[in-house]
Amino acid sequence: MNIFENAKWIWRDADAEKEEYVFFEKTFNCDPERVCLFIAAETDYIAYVNEKRVSFNQFSGYRNEKYYDEIDISSFCQKGENTLRVTVRHEGVNSACRISDGAGLIFSVRENEKEIAFSDEETLSSLSSEYTSYIVRHITGQLGLSSTMDSREKKEEKKRSREVSLCMNLLPRPVKPLEILEKRRAVPIETSGRRIYDLGREECGYLYLRVKCESEGLVRVVYGEHVTDGCVRYRIGGRDFSLDFNCRAGESYFEQLFVRVAGRYFEVFGDTEVLEIGLIPVLYPLTEKPIDEKIKGLDRRIYETAVRTLRLCMHTHYEDCPWREQALYVLDSRNQMLCGYDAFFESDFQRANLVFISKGKREDSLLELTYPAVNTPAIPFFSVMYPVAVYEYVCATGDKSIIPEVVDTMRGIMNTLYGRITDRGLIPNLPSPYWNFYEWSDFSAGHNELGNNAPRAEKYDLILNCAFIYSAERFSALCEEIGESADFDLDSIKEAVSREFFMPESGAFKLSSAYDTVSQLGCAFALLVGLGDERTLSFVRCEREGVIPATLSMLGYVYDALIKSDENAVEFVLDDIRKKYSYMLEKGATSFWETINGDSDFANAGSLCHGWSAMPIYYLNRLL
């Protein structure tokens, strides 16, 4: 069945601009029996049937592949005439979560598979009166634009629409729709003259607001994860975590469904009485596995908080952090996937994300930084670890059917990096625009590379080359499962790694060909690929002076290296988890942080909920 057999991509009869909101209206007649709405939009949509909301939250696609939602609207329909109204937001900017690809709406209404209404030029459209168009104000570069709602009286002039040219390769939404939970009301807290409201814990969802104004005016709601400064810290560098509401005189009620927010606190600015403020929480629908009885006391608190952290970072796809970025990264999601096999019964979300990532290829066959996105400062280390995530999925689920779907992407990554090996037998750091990042620590973050297009001196990094070996071993195993081969001379790369980075006088591996700095993560990766000796273990345990400790995101590789190489590793790993994660709990964490430095990191932009920090789930299940 061609679902969109007569439907066209449409927009109002004018060229679309950035941050434009358009509503569309179409009437249809039905019995009704089984009536379904098939719908997709660029950038996002909210759909209503007979004034009742039936769906929102577009799954963002690539330029050559879009995704549609299928919604059973039978219970919203009546016999005879019905009205479909759709508000569409065209954001018009690239971000870490979306690719700007024009403005448009396409839909088909079907009763018992017969098309009874569809998007075409006869569909009425107008600028939306519920949103203020053309206010281009970024929340963050990763999230994209903020949004302004409007309750003032404005006339909507409905006219015919026009057809627009957008991709007709439309596939079903690859993941389930979000689960909408009961509203969570924020309560005012005692402050010195500021209107601050507390949700009680870290949450993620959509803001709702009821206010009363003496006259028309602007109300601004800002949101954040803490009140360390005695207020909600919402302007951080170039970031602006705020939503605006143009209010009429009297009472206004808003539900802002175009911007998903996260945090714990709201602060309200403007000449208004706040009647109610809170969040409509949303989570990806999952069934949590019972926690093993052996996980008790502090370990159980850590485990439960880690699961909560995972849930807050799963919506249309995995997210690094729900507050600041909401972006899908390979390395962040690899940690989330690994923990999810233990935390939840389902694994369809992991599979869908792995397949979706595989489509985010650059011209040179490496992966973009996030998905869907274009022209990103892509990270080679993240690309090379993609086969590892696929391998772990196959091991955890037994589902080998994913391998043929993503093998070309994996092979492209591995062949591209292998083809860059120089006469020193190693993969060099990649030139601009690549970002040679490994973790947020000294000498591993590539800070000086972001936005710097100047030529770079040839340099070799320990972690990239060890990660290639680590990934190639797993990629080869995946290839064997489908009768293919992967031919890489890993022994030669190992010899080159030892020759370039091993320091025989200490047993450590230096991070780079450019300096002798040693990190816990670098030595851990050396052990993971079979290099080093017993002395290297002391650096992985951070028992030697000057070793740069691994950050929360990379602790899994440290723990794996110790478990592989040290018969006494179990207590070390458990003690390390308890020390680091109890510290966050003692500081009031209701989800686990991006780094152990909390909100003060990244020039006061550290996230207090980050999916990559859920790793205790994996180790508590195995080591207790």
Please provide the spans of the model-predicted regions.
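Active-site core of glycosidic bond-cleaving carbohydrate-active enzymes
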Residues: G92, L328-F344, D348-L624
